[in-house]
Structure formats: C-alpha cells, structure tokens
C-alpha cells in the first residue's frame, strides 16, 4: 500500500449574508480547475498552520482560523494518495500572492458552481453555517 501524503488547505471567506464571498484559486496541476488553496505540511508544522500558510502563499489572504471543516478528503494523483484537511478562515487582510495563481472572490452559489470537485463543494456547503455565525469577541 502506498504512503498517504498529508496536506492542508484553507476555505477562506469574507463578508456575510448577501455580501458573503468565497476565495478560490486556479490549480497549477490542472489548467482551468478552480480549487481552495492547499498544499504540503512542512516539518514541525501543524495541519492548521499549513492551511493558513498555504492560503497566504497561494492567494495572499490572511485571517482568523475558525477550525477544521469536515473529515480529510482523500484523492489519488500521479501515483500517490493524498489526504487533505481543510480549515475555515475568516479573511482579514489581503496582499499579493507569491505563486502566480489566479484568485477569485465569488458569491457563495457561484463558488459552489465553479469548484471543480464535488467533494470540495460538499465541504463548502458544510462550512456555510459557520460562515454566517456571529463573530465571537
């Protein structure tokens, strides 16, 4: 059995209600695919730290970590098995991204339609109630 490669990613959002927007980025490996920022977990880094870091590197977005979303998603790519834990991030600041991806802030329903994979669409639906919850002081 192949070794599973752990990864982490961020489901970043801003606004609420009608102004709720979801962050998507283009995939570097699959042209035309829209995904959430994600990537490898560095040595000594937690999955949550990696999710925040990947979101900043790939999209230039930082924010408040609100915790994991769902169970890790598993997929096979190029002969390897990957397991990705996504984390919900309330965006608080933006800067230029460092890896040249196209980014988009989309209304919730448009983000659902543009996501390239059903499992990430499911996670976005699962996360929505937490996006609409009032901020805690």
Residue ranges and their predicted role:
Residues 18-61:
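Conserved Nudix-box catalytic region and its N-terminal flanking loop in Nudix hydrolases
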Residues 113-137:
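Charged phosphate-binding loop/patch that engages nucleotide di/tri-phosphates or the phosphate backbone
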Residues 8, 39, 53, 106-109:
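Structural detector for helix-capping/boundary residues
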């Amino acid at each position: 059995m192949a070794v599973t490669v752990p990864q982490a990613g961020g489901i970043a959002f801003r606004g609420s209600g009608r102004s709720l927007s979801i962050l998507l980025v283009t995939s570097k490996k699959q042209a035309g695919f829209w995904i959430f920022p994600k990537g490898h977990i560095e040595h000594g880094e937690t999955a949550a730290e990696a999710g925040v870091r990947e979101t900043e590197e790939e999209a230039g977005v930082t924010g408040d970590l609100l915790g994991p979303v769902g169970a890790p998603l598993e997929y096979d790519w190029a002969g390897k098995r990957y397991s990705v834990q996504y984390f919900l991030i309330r965006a608080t600041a933006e800067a230029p991204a460092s890896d040249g991806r196209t980014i988009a802030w989309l209304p919730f329903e448009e983000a659902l339609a543009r996501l390239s994979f059903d499992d990430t669409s499911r996670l976005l639906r699962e996360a929505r109630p937490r996006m609409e919850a009032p901020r805690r002081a």
